[in-house]
Each structure stands twice: as C-alpha cells, then as structure tokens.
C-alpha cells in the first residue's frame, strides 16, 4: 500500500459496511418503530412461533400462514423495540410441529403476551390474521408506549465525514 493510498480520504464506505450501517440505522433511528415502554410496569414480551415440518422436507420449516404477522413483527418491528427498551426481556419460542404432533389436538395460541410486574398489568394480544404493523400498533396502544422524539434518535452517517 502506497503512502498516497494511506492518506487519501475515502469518498464512500465499502458496500458491505454501508449495508451494515443502513441496517443499524433502521433499528436505532427509525421514527416509526421508536417507542419506549414503561419499564416500571412491564418486564417481558413473549411470543410463540409455530412451524410445520413435512416428513419429506426434514430440513425446511414451513411457516403457518397465521404466523405471518408475528414473523413480520419479529423481523421489522421488534429489533427497534428491543434497542429502545434494554430493560425489557424479549422471549420468542420457536415451536416445531411435525406429523406426529399434528395428529393430536394441539392448541396453537397466536398471542403476544406482555408480562407486567403486577398481575393487573399482564396483557395478551391476539395475533391471528393480523399483519405485523397491526400487532405493533395494538401493542403500542395497549401498553401506552411513548414515541421517542426524532431529535433524540441518533443516526450513523452513511458517508464518511471530512
């Protein structure tokens, strides 16, 4: 590496670093998903995700369509909620239903359970047939979560500074 390359200022980040920065910014600086739950009232969010496994395809999991909203919530909304609520515990149970279990009557509850420090603060949100956005909106509304001001959100610059 020449001295010229060492002292030359970078004009852009490398593509893989840029993708990572953009992903982090979606989590920490997205005003749509940035909410703070009352840490003195709630202690845990619990979700169960059910997967059906077919006998011929032992390696691949087939997601139950009633869980699509939960999966969308986990992928798009929960990372930001986790970041802004570090004292809140998030528990996700991945439950595999194979052919042996599917013959039995298994009660599949598509619930988002919110555990409070007191029993009166416990909440359940029915997730069947709802999109991730609707589940998230109901979570925010029922818990009384407070939206974080955009001025408080920190965004990592996507271009090197001089």
Segments predicted by a language model, with ranges:
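N-terminal organelle transit peptides
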Residues: 1-83, 106, 120, 148, ...
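Conserved beta-strand elements of beta-rich interaction domains across eukaryotes
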Residues: 52-54, 95-97, 119-120, 132
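Short acidic, gly/pro-rich beta-turn/loop elements at beta-sheet edges
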Residues: 57, 100, 135
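Eukaryotic basic, amphipathic alpha-helical target segments in cytosolic regions
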Residues: 82-85, 89, 143, 147
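Short, structured protein-protein interaction patches enriched in aromatics and acidic/basic residues
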Residues: 84-115
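Helix-rich interaction surfaces within compact, conserved domain-sized segments
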Residues: 106-162
């Amino acid at each position: 590496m020449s001295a010229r390359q060492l002292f030359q200022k970078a004009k852009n980040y490398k593509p893989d670093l840029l993708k990572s920065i953009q992903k982090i910014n979606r989590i920490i600086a997205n005003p749509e998903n940035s909410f703070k739950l009352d840490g003195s009232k709630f202690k845990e969010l619990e979700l169960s995700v059910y997967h059906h496994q077919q006998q011929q395809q032992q390696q691949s999991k087939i997601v139950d369509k009633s869980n699509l909203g939960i999966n969308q919530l986990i992928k798009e909304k929960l990372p930001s909620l986790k970041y802004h609520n570090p004292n809140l515990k998030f528990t996700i149970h991945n439950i595999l239903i194979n052919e042996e279990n599917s013959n039995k009557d298994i009660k599949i509850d598509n619930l988002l359970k919110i555990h409070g420090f007191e029993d009166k603060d416990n909440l359940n949100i029915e997730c069947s047939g709802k999109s991730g956005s609707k589940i998230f909106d109901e979570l925010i509304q029922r818990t009384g979560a407070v939206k974080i001001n955009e001025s408080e959100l920190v965004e990592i610059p996507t271009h090197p500074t001089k």
